[in-house]
Amino acid sequence: MSLLKKSFLLFCCIILSQVLKAQDAPYTMGFIPASISEVDVAFPLIEKWNLSGQADMQLVTQGAYTNGNPFEYTQRKVIRPWIIYSGFKNMKLWLGYAHNQKYAIEEAGNYKTLENRLIVMGTYTQEMPKGSLFEQVRFETKFFDDRNGNHQTIPRLRARFGVNHYLRQSKEKPIFLAPNIGYYTELMLKFASKDYADEHFDIFRLSVYYTAGITPNIHFLAGVIGQMQLRTNGTQFDVYYGPMVSLKYSVRPKERETFDSVDGGAD
């Protein structure tokens, strides 16, 4: 895991030099192991309007600065329903709501709060001979009470670019169906009030994963994630890293599932 941490730290330093302005106070950095587990259920709604739905359930656990166990504490539990419009070629539009129950973790400075999000998202996919590219823009507004009990309403803009490589299947009866190797980078900018946070930079995230089908209706993702988040004090970076797994059930069979919209992360 140390190699992953070093590589991610080097890449993040390059990104930071481009997206953060200089400050008098020095930056500090802490490393926190984490894990993300998710189960999704996708189902049709109104076919003639190209509408479908999806329900996501997510569990995020973490360690702390001096605790290397990514499963030590429960960070948050999430329920996230979506309505999806797929009437455009190569594009999907998503409208969603997220119910985030976050828990206190004294060692990491986390406090207990209930966070709700309203989300609008668009994903554009470009098919390639042996894979696909995708660009995703997500606008969400977060509603929660901060550690002082003050209510906060914070818009956040997220931009993701990803690549999927379709892997060959040489066996007549393979164990997994339509396997892929995927990876993406994602940048998140927050627009909070000055009394909460001065900086717009919020999170930079990287993820690499393997996806495949168990059956035409059940697909899974297994990978790793690394992300760097700026705390609201403007000088402390938390670097989260660890495993990510996801299982998706589609009521309608799918030949291939690449999990382009998976929301794997610890913030």
Where are these regions (language model features)?
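Transmembrane beta-strands of outer-membrane beta-barrel proteins
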Residues: L51-G53, M91-L95, V120, G131-V137, ...
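Residues on the lipid-exposed face of transmembrane beta-strands in outer-membrane beta-barrel proteins
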Residues: S37-F43, P81-Y85, V120-Q126, F139, ...
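Start-of-domain marker
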Residues: Q23-I84
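Short loop/turn motifs that connect adjacent beta-strands in outer-membrane beta-barrel proteins
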Residues: L45-N50, N90, E127-L133, L167-P179, ...
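Bacterial Sec-dependent N-terminal signal peptides
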Residues: M1-T28, V251
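Sequence/structural signature of outer-membrane beta-barrel proteins
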Residues: Q23-A25, D56-N67, A98-A108, E140-N148, ...
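Outer-membrane beta-barrel transmembrane domain signature
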Residues: R138-R231
